[in-house]
Regions:
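Short acidic, Pro/Gly- and aromatic-enriched capping/linker segments at domain boundaries
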Residues: 412-420
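Segments forming glycine/polar-rich beta-alpha architectures that bind adenosine-containing cofactors
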Residues: 422-424, 430-431
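Segments of small-molecule ligand-sensing domains
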Residues: 398-412
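Non-catalytic alpha/beta scaffold blocks inside enzyme catalytic domains
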Residues: 2-201, 207-390, 445-448, 452-563
Length: 563
């Protein structure tokens, strides 16, 4: 979205959902991965919104929601959510979006001046003519093959879109973990721009992140490609010249450790070897380092996969009281809709020897850098207000940070496209993009696999062996497969298979002895649990333009497991 809108964050707020006429949910399972969103969807539904779910799996949280905070949710049937469910084939989202946009443009041609938002397009957008010309060549049969949908289903979605004055399209990792994730998201922007669905209440693109503070990390500079203006602000604030060359993301870091160009790993939280793709390659890469350091709030698999020397540094979690020289501290979080709020621990730490992450990082910096840079590391540790004061001088939107964060509800960061219909792109306008439709070719007898989370799971942390919404008990080594595919492959529900991924590098990656579960997933598509299925995803299989592991489009073959 940064290329098309100038800002790579959600252009809606939490309250916008209740103002929308139509909400399209793509590649997302809010019931398991983003439960707070269910309340927003329920409020939208009660306010009259129509909801369309686009997903290979008919997830419970997309269909109905029983809100435990309402009487109806406790003893009634709950709230029906999706008015239309499009059971799309994996990696078919880009084709669907282009097909809907083409229908919108065709409707405008049939009824000139009545479908598109011409005033918005003329004032705020560029590239419509090129986009329109490109879609003239879109082949309907190609679309239907890529999506697994019927033309009538796409027609219905297009009609819903054209009837709605305010439209939100929201998505999660079901879209971002494909090779063509970046152009797919650009197609979301294209569709929204056609009818001016950006920069007005109840409308806009809404990416939902996979972790509670991943967006806040990026805002604070945790990115390998921070822009020069951010680095300039750091230099001005702290009096040193930060590196100007690009760094490495997680996939690039694993490659570097594998190849020996990276010799030290310092992991601030996380469970790298279990979260990243190509598990065996990742484990070998970390073991190839001279030193691995894990700064962690709890033990995980990565602590058993270490370099030649290893340190595990326990750290306070944000549920624990963090006492420093100036008193009890709090930290801050930026959520997926740009809202910033404080988080303060209430639990006594298990030991007074456990340090906060801020303490560990600042003490490391002081020990390594000393007086080489003019930074008051001790001041940072003693009072997090000092950290926030510096942030307020460096990061746009955080001016007067210490005052605003103490407001009861925190504050929402400014967003030029959302707030003012201003687009900080090189042209000053929102940009339509032209994206070539490229679908996955699946050989006969092969399937497309995606990795998914279970309900009792948060990222790589699993709390039970059950998945209540999908009816799975006492096990995670399972493969969800459609009844049609079971029949075509002459396999039986409850049988066991070895899953082999087929990649251009010719490496035989295999996940053995998965129990088959007949499930109403899209034909030709199967699903296995993350992180177990990471062993099947090649490290070099990533989204073009973002380098995100393509964990939702893995071509696999199934072979019966030996008894």
């Amino acid at each position: 979205m940064g290329e098309t809108l100038g800002v790579g964050k959600s252009a809606v707020t939490y309250t916008d959902f209740a103002k929308a006429d139509l909400i399209v949910i793509m590649g997302q399972n809010p019931g398991t991965c983003h439960p707070r969103m269910l309340t927003a969807l329920e409020e939208a539904k009660m306010a009259g919104a129509s909801i369309v779910a686009v997903n290979p799996l008919p997830e419970a949280g997309l269909i109905n929601f029983k809100n435990p905070q309402r009487v109806r949710g406790l003893i009634g049937k709950g709230t029906d959510l999706a008015d239309q469910f499009l059971q799309i084939r994996l990696a078919g989202d880009m084709a669907l979006l282009q097909a809907v946009s083409k229908r919108v443009l065709d409707a405008e041609r049939a009824r000139p001046g009545t479908v598109l938002d011409h005033a918005f397009l003329a004032e705020h957008c560029q590239g419509l003519e090129e986009f329109q010309a490109h879609l003239e060549g879109l082949d309907e049969e190609h679309v239907l093959a890529a999506t697994g949908l019927r033309s009538e289903e796409i027609d219905e979605l297009a009609e819903r879109y054209m009837r709605a004055e305010r439209v939100i399209i929201t998505w999660a990792m079901g879209l971002t973990q494909h090779k063509k994730a970046v152009p797919t998201i650009k197609e979301i922007v294209n569709l929204l721009l056609l009818r001016g669905n950006i920069g007005k209440p109840g409308a806009g693109p809404s990416p939902i992140r996979g972790h509670s503070n991943v967006q806040g990390d990026r805002t604070m500079g945790i990115w390998e490609k921070m822009p020069p203006r951010f680095l300039d602000a750091l230099q001005m604030e702290f009096g040193f010249d930060p590196p100007r060359h690009e760094g490495l993301d997680s996939v690039g870091s694993i490659r570097g450790m594998r190849d020996g160009t990276i010799k030290v790993l310092v992991a601030l939280g996380g469970n790298l070897v279990h979260a990243i793709s190509d598990t065996s390659v990742a484990e070998a890469a970390v073991r190839n380092t001279r030193l691995s350091v894990q700064i962690s709030t709890k033990l995980n698999r990565s602590h058993a996969v270490v370099g030649q020397e290893a340190l595990i540094l326990p750290a306070l979690g944000r549920t624990e009281i963090d006492r420093q020289a100036s008193g009890e501290q709090f930290v801050t979080v930026e959520d997926t809709v740009c809202a910033v709020h404080s988080s303060i621990g209430r639990l006594e730490p298990i030991s007074d020897q456990v340090l906060s992450e801020v303490s560990i990082v600042t003490r490391m910096a002081k020990a390594v850098l000393g007086d080489k840079v003019p930074v008051d590391w001790a001041g940072f540790e003693h009072s997090y207000d000092v950290v926030r004061e510096h942030i307020s001088h460096v990061v746009p939107g955080f001016e007067d940070f210490n005052t605003k964060i103490r407001l009861r509800d925190g504050f929402v960061l400014p967003h030029a496209p959302r707030d003012q219909r201003q687009f900080p792109t090189p042209t000053g306008k929102a940009m339509f993009s032209v994206n070539e439709l490229d679908t996955i070719e699946v050989p006969p007898g092969r399937l497309i696999l995606q990795s998914v989370r279970s309900h009792d799971q948060f990222n790589t942390t699993t709390y039970s062996m059950n998945d209540r919404y999908r009816g799975v008990k006492k096990g995670r080594l399972v493969l969800f497969i459609s009844p049609e595919d079971l029949a075509e492959l002459d396999l039986a529900d409850g049988g066991y298979v070895d899953v082999h991924s087929e990649a251009p590098d010719g490496v035989d990656r295999v996940l053995r002895r998965l129990r088959l579960i007949s499930y109403p997933t899209a034909k030709g598509c199967v699903a296995a649990y993350f992180p177990e299925a990471n062993v099947l995803v090649p490290l070099d299989s990533t989204a073009e333009g973002s380098n995100t592991p393509a964990s939702k489009s893995v071509i696999v073959r199934l072979e019966p497991s030996p008894n």
